[in-house]
C-alpha cells in the first residue's frame, strides 16, 4: 500500500468501478423497502457553485447511508433547463438558447460525476427535451377538459422597445434592464391554472406533513392565506355594484372612501372625461406589478368623481384611484377605513380625507392616538349606530346578518392564494398546446399531435419572441374544423416543469404515459432537499400537481415529498457567495487541488445541514489533513501483515482492550443515530475523529490488540463511506476485503461491547469535587462508600471529621457530608 494519499487517482479508480458495475442503477423490487432521495435539480447555468455542491453532498450522504441500511435506493439527477438566463446568454454570446443549455448540461454533468455522487444516470432528464415536456402539454389539455384551465387578461411589465414582457426582477428603477425604456403595465391575455380549486386541501394537508420544517409549513399557510370575512356590495349610481371583501366588518361604519386599482373599469371610465386622471393612470401603468414594489411606493391617488353608497348608512363616499391597489388581487377595489388601517391612514392624511374612529381599545393598556397612526387592533365598536358596544365577534355576526338580510353582502371564505398564471411571453420554454381558431376559439392540441415542439434553431436577439416571427411554427389548422388557425406563441412558466419532474424520474423511458405503475412503487419521495427560498412557489405548485395527478389516477399518494430538508446557504466572509460580491469559490479548482472527498468532508463537517455554512480555507485543509492521517494509519496497520487471520476473542480481552472496543461501538451507535435519525452529520464526523484520536493512542501490538485495531479501522471506513466514498472504497480493499464496500451493510453496535463492567464516579465532600473512583457497575453501596472514603485526596478533606451522611447519585457521584 502506497503510504501517500493520492486523492485524484483514488477517486478516478472508485468512479470507474461504480460506472463499470452500474452500482447506482435502481430498479423496482417489491421485496425491499424503497428509499427515494431527491435533491432539487439545478438550472444548467454552466458551472456548479458551492451551494449546489452542499445540496447534492447532503443528498448523497443520506442516499448512501440508506443503501447500506438495506433500502432499495433511488437517487436521480436531471436539469431544470428552460428559463430566462438562457435567453440572456443567447443575446450576450450570440448562440441559440438550446445550444448554450446543452453545452452547459454536458459540462455540469461531468462536474457532478467528478464529485462521486451516487446518481442513477440512466434516469437523467432535461425539461427542455420534447419527450419530457410532451407530458406536461398533455396534462394541460386534460386540465383544460376538466375546467381547471382558463384565460383572462392580467397585468404584466411591458418593455415598449424590446416588445417583450419583463419579470419583476428585470425592472430596475422603473426601466427595462436591457433597453433602458420606461416599463409599462399592460393587460394581456394569460392562461391560468385553478390552483384555488385545491386551496382548502393544500392548506389542511399541511398538518400531515410532519416531516417538513414548521417554518416551511407556516410560509405555505400564510401564502394560501385562508380568511373568513364578508363580501360587501357598495352600490354606484348607474353602474355595477362594487364588490369588496373584508375580514374586518367591525370597521365597516368607519369607511370614508373606496379605493380602486388604476386598471379598474370605473377608473378608466372616469378618465375619459378627466385628462389629469388619464395622465395619472398612465403613470400607474409605468409601475412594476409586484406587491413588494407597490408596498414601498409613496401613496398616490386621484378622485374619480364617482360615489359609492355605504350599504348600512346609505351615505355617499368618494371612489378614489390608488396606486397601491392591484387589479389582479381580489376585485380590484377595497373599502378604506383610515382610522383602522395604516395604509388607508397614510393615504387619507396626504389627501385630507375624513378619518372616522369606530373601534376603541377594550382596556387602558392599548394606546389609540389617531393623530399619529391608525388603531389597527380589535376592540369595542363606537360611533357605529346599533352596533356600538359590540366586540369583534359580536359585530362580525350582527353586521353579516344585517347585510345578508338586505342583499348587500354575504359571508365568504377567501384565500390570499391566486390562480397560477402559467403564460410567459418568452421563447425558451415549453409551448402551450393551444390552437386559436376564428370560428372555434381556443382548442387544445389533440393528444396524437403532441408534443408541440419548440424550434431550437432560431436567431434570438431579445426583441420579441422568435415564435412570433416563425410562420412555420404558428401557422396551423384547427383540430376541430380544419380551418386556418394560429398556434399559441406563449410558453409555460418554468415552474410548470419543476412541479412534476420528481414523478417522471420513476419512468423516464415510458413513451405511452406521463407516470406509470413504477410511480406507485417509488412515490412519494422519502427525502427531498433544497433551499428554503422554494418554500412557497415550487413546493406549493408540486403539491398541487401531485393532487391533480392523483385525481387523474396517475399516482396513488396524496403528497409528493414525505420529508423535507432545507439546507442553509454557503457564506464567505459572512456574506452569501455571489459573483457580484466577488466572494465565490470554484468547486472545480477545489476538487482538482484536494479531491472530491475533502470537499465533501468539509461541507458535512463545517455546519449542520439546515444552518448556514461559513467557507474556511483552513477548514478545507483540516479535512484534507484528516484524510491523509486516516490513510497513514491504515497503511501502518496493514504493513503488520493485514492478511493474517485476526480473530477477535472478546472473552479474552483485558480491561484496556475492552475499554477501547467500547469506544469503537459507542462511535458506531452515535454515528448511526446522528446520520440516520438526527441528520447532524457534523457531530457524527466529530465522533469518528475522536475515535481516530483514541486509535492513535491505542498502543497494543498483541494479536488481540491488532484484531481490535482492525475492527476499529473497518468501523471508521464504513462510517465514513457515505461521506468520503472514494477513499473508503480503496481503504476497504487495503484492509483485506475482496468485496467492494458499496455492497457492505452499515455496521451495528455490539450491545455486549457497550455494556460497561465499571463506571467512574465523582467524589464530593460537602458538595465540592475532591476526587474520582472507578467501581464495578453492580457494586454494592457499602463498597462504593468504602472506596470513596479511601480515595487519597478525599481522605485529606475528611480526616479528623465525622461523616454524617453519604449521598449516592447512581452512575454519577458520591457526596460525603462531613462536620
UniProtKB/Swiss-Prot annotation:
UniProt EC number: 6.1.1.4
Motif 'KMSKS' region positions after renumbering to this chain: 576-580
Protein name: Leucine--tRNA ligase
Pfam families reported for this sequence: Anticodon_1, tRNA-synt_1, tRNA-synt_1_2, tRNA-synt_1g
Location (main, coarse): cytoplasm
Sequence motif 'HIGH' region, location on chain: 42-52
Taxonomic lineage from the root: Bacteria, Pseudomonadati, Pseudomonadota, Gammaproteobacteria, Chromatiales
MF terms in GO: aminoacyl-tRNA deacylase activity; ATP binding; leucine-tRNA ligase activity
First-tier enzyme category under EC: ligase
Gene Ontology terms: biological process: leucyl-tRNA aminoacylation
Subcellular location per the Swiss-Prot or TrEMBL entry: Cytoplasm
Family: Belongs to the class-I aminoacyl-tRNA synthetase family.
Zinc is among the record's keywords: no
InterPro entries assigned to the protein according to its UniProt record, in alphabetical order: aa-tRNA-synth_I_CS, aa-tRNA-synth_Ia, Leu-tRNA-ligase, Leu_tRNA-synth_edit, M/V/L/I-tRNA-synth_anticd-bd, Methionyl/Leucyl_tRNA_Synth, Rossmann-like_a/b/a_fold, tRNAsynth_Ia_anticodon-bd
Gene coding for it: leuS
SUPFAM superfamilies reported in the protein's UniProt record: Anticodon-binding domain of a subclass of class I aminoacyl-tRNA synthetases, Nucleotidylyl transferase, ValRS/IleRS/LeuRS editing domain
